[in-house]
UniProtKB/Swiss-Prot annotation:
Belongs to the intercrine alpha (chemokine CxC) family. The gene is PPBP. Pfam families: IL8 (PF00048). This is Platelet basic protein. Gene3D superfamilies: 2.40.50.40. Disulfide bonds join 63-89, 65-105. The keyword Nucleus does not apply. It is found in: Secreted. The keyword Nucleotidyltransferase does not apply. GO terms for biological process: antimicrobial humoral immune response mediated by antimicrobial peptide; cellular response to lipopolysaccharide; D-glucose transmembrane transport; defense response to bacterium; inflammatory response; neutrophil chemotaxis; positive regulation of cell division. Proteolytic removal of residues 1-9 produces the active peptide connective tissue-activating peptide III (CTAP-III) (low-affinity platelet factor IV (LA-PF4)). Proteolytic removal of residues 1-13 produces the active peptide beta-thromboglobulin, which is released from platelets along with platelet factor 4 and platelet-derived growth factor. The lineage of its organism: Eukaryota, Metazoa, Chordata, Craniata, Vertebrata. InterPro entries: Chemokine_b/g/d (IPR039809), Chemokine_CXC (IPR001089), Chemokine_CXC_CS (IPR018048), Chemokine_IL8-like_dom (IPR001811), CXC_Chemokine_domain (IPR033899), Interleukin_8-like_sf (IPR036048). Keywords: Antibiotic, Antimicrobial, Chemotaxis, Cleavage on pair of basic residues, Cytokine, Disulfide bond, Growth factor, Mitogen, Secreted, Signal. Its main location: secreted.
Length: 128
């Protein structure tokens, strides 16, 4: 009766699969790290100021407008941005860029703001 021990462990056949699993996990980790660092700021060493990366590349995952106003004269508005309801926010948001560069949130339910939005969309600059 000859008992020969198998000198090759049975786990050798599973090593390529294990290596693939490790590589997959590492690639997922690197992908997650790379995407999380894109939104961080970088330091401008020449000026000593922080400047943020281009914010147009990233979508906000929450409502942009916390406080709204309806008391704005249409002649002060340079442009309007209307953001519809979505998964990020359950209300319509109207963001006005003023001629001095500031951005303010307008109340989309106010009759005056509705009229301003309609006139701006129609291309009429004389909305009252």
């Amino acid at each position: 009766m000859s008992l020969r021990l198998d000198t090759t462990p049975s786990c050798n056949s599973a090593r390529p699969l294990h290596a693939l699993q490790v590589l997959l996990l590492l690639s997922l980790l690197l992908t997650a790290l790379a995407s999380s660092t894109k939104g961080q700021t970088k330091r401008n060493l020449a000026k000593g100021k922080e400047e943020s990366l281009d914010s147009d590349l990233y979508a906000e995952l929450r409502c942009m407008c916390i406080k709204t106003t309806s008391g704005i004269h249409p002649k002060n508005i340079q442009s309007l941005e209307v953001i519809g309801k979505g998964t990020h926010c359950n209300q319509v948001e109207v963001i006005a860029t003023l001629k001095d560069g500031r951005k303010i949130c307008l109340d989309p339910d106010a009759p005056r703001i509705k009229k301003i939005v309609q006139k701006k969309l129609a291309g009429d600059e004389s909305a009252d």
